[in-house]
Structure formats: structure tokens, C-alpha cells
């Protein structure tokens, strides 16, 4: 229970069918000010406690601040410092919410966890595997809140132990149930951006986490010529336009970063498009691994529309992905997720 409306409604939907307990994760230290923008904030914890109490459900608070800092936040910082652009929500789901939390509740005799994610899962008798499926609306149309992208790293064991009661519901339906149930958070805003960087200042978080500041360096053009100065590699990501300046005679975008040399390469928007990427650290869901090339759709960002592509296995842990049409701003450190009409399978962006 995050204290948000989605996990609260998941509780409402399940409490009369199962013996339910509520678990909330403490992931951050209070800053002594309003921390309502943080996932697992003091206000969120109080909301979760109140909702569990309303329905007579046992509530437990698990302190995972050290683990969260040493895994999710540390990996986020290291990725940025190496010039990559990570998605910490993916690692948090795999390592914390469906990892450490699941391990903790199993020790208390609980075999399944339910969350407020907008996603579906099912067991496929033919393959003998659990499948991860996109959220849909009641009429079968695509659900704009689908979160399958950030859950693609879940293992077969994690999927088998997970329940997703909101997989065929809209946000409006969720809020309606919450209001009818008298939940105090029925109109609570959705969380935005990375939960531990609610202000979107990634560079500021990295400086606070490491205790270091990071030097400015050279802007390069596509041919390696110095064309200006940047304020630090950690302030930029592939495809970025904002904050670069306008003194180059034409619109310029970040097309590359080199953390070792402390340089940021700029170029025109056209240079951001490619039809090929390579991915490793694979996590296949619908099968153990592909025997041969296959066609599907893929996305490299959470809010991106899936694009048709062909996936070419190169060994058991690397693939080459060729898109039917070029896509914009393929970024090292991001994740690529493969989808078909039947299932979702996936590797991590290399």
C-alpha cells in the first residue's frame, strides 16, 4: 500500500475475497519539510495506515531505506555518472517491490502480493509460463495507464506470486470506487516523475547523494569540434534541447555523451533517428529464449508508442533490433520492451 488511490482500491477489491494484510514500504528519510512528493513519504504512510484501519486490515510498515539507497538510488547515480540514462522504476519493481517485499511476506506465510499496477498477468497452459500482458479497458481497448513497461523485469517466480486487480480498469473507474468506498485519497493526484526526485532535478539529487559537484566541459559538434561549454555531463540526456542555448545558428540537440572525457555532443534533430539498437541483460517472459529471429513491436520509453521491428538473437543474452522505420533518441541505459499480440517479452537497452 503506497498510500495512493490505486493500491487502496486494490485492497477494496480483494478484502472480501481473501485474507488480506497491508504492507507499506518506507524508502526515504523525512526531510523535515513537506515530503508529499516522495513515494513512501510520511503522509503516504499515514494514508495507508488509515485506509487499512478503515477496513480492519492489519497494516505493516517495512523499513527498506538502506536497501533502496544501496540498490535503486546507487544504480541510478552510477548510471548517470557513466553517461547512461536509467529508469529506476524498473529496478525498484524487480528488486524492491517484487523482490525484497515478496521475500519478506513469504517469511510470514503469505504466498501472493497484490499491487495497484495497471497490468495483467496469466498462466499459459501451452507454454507452461506466466505471461505479462498490457492493461486494457473493459471494452478491450488499450488502457492509457498501462504499466507493463516498468514491470518487464519480473521473473516467472515473481509473476506467479503477483496479483494485479486493476488490469482491466480505467483511472476514472478507480477513483469512482475509491469515492464510493469513502477513501480519504480518492482524489489524490498521481505521482509524477521519479519518486525520489519529485522536482525533476536529477543532477541536484546526484550531487546530494555523492557529496560531489561535477565540472563543466566542452560541447562538441558531430565532427568532434569544440563549439561551446556545458555545465556538467549529468545535466544532459540524449534528445535534450532545453538548456543548451541558442548561439549555434540552428536548433541543437544532445546526440551523445562521453562521461570519461566530460564531453557532450550536439547535432541536428535528424541525427537522433536510427533504425537499429542492441540490447543485452535479457529477461524473456513468454519463452526461455528465442530460437530464431521474430517480428513484434517494441518501445524504448515508458510513454512511447510501440513500433514494428524485427529482433535478431545474437547468442542467449544479446539481440539486435531493427525497426521498420527510424525512431528518435535511442538512449544508452534505457530499456527496450518487446510486445506481440499475445505476450510481452523483453531485454534491457544496451
Language-model-detected regions and their locations in the chain:
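ATP-dependent adenylation/nucleotidyltransferase module used to activate substrates
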Residues: 1-153, 163, 172-173, 179, ...
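Short, glycine- and charge-enriched coil/turn segments that flank and shape catalytic ligand pockets
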Residues: 34-36, 108, 122-131, 209-214, ...
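Conserved small/polar residues in nucleotide/adenosyl-binding loops
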Residues: 342-349
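Short, glycine-/aromatic-enriched active-site segment of Class I SAM-dependent methyltransferases
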Residues: 160
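Basic, glycine-rich polyanion-binding accessory segments appended to enzymes
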Residues: 250, 258-340
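Anionic-ligand-binding alpha/beta catalytic cores of soluble enzymes and soluble regulatory domains
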Residues: 177-283
